[in-house]
């Protein structure tokens, strides 16, 4: 399990960020990390068709169906939760505890506010 050694959600998020950076770097994309942590995205990735804001999420949570569920809400530095707003980021990159990754465009997330169930 990918998050076995993680002692809190912040360390789990750090593992997710590392996985995302490795994923995009292996594709040959340039990855930039914003200077601060107050925006609603974690990375800026240079895709062939331009720069994309990428939000990285991790999950160990499963629905009753056994499929992974990932929350879309973002947390501010003061522990405030914000529901997903279209345009907050261009790409959602998800990492499960098994190391499986998923990418969703903002178009694919239309209609969702709090969470999505991953396909498998």
Residues covered by each model-derived region:
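Charged phosphate-binding loop/patch that engages nucleotide di/tri-phosphates or the phosphate backbone
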Residues: 1-3, 101-120
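Acidic-basic catalytic patches of nuclease active cores, encompassing PD-(D/E)XK
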Residues: 1-32
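Conserved catalytic cores of phosphodiester-cleaving nucleases, focusing on short active-site segments
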Residues: 24, 43-45, 50-58
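A generic local structural motif
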Residues: 31, 40, 77-81
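Active-site metal-binding core of divalent-cation-utilizing nuclease and nuclease-like domains
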Residues: 31-38, 47-48
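A structural signal for short, well-ordered beta-strand segments and their strand-loop junctions
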Residues: 33, 53-55, 103
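Short, surface-exposed beta-edge/turn micro-motifs
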Residues: 40-41, 51, 88-91
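Catalytic cores of nucleic-acid endonucleases
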Residues: 57-102, 107
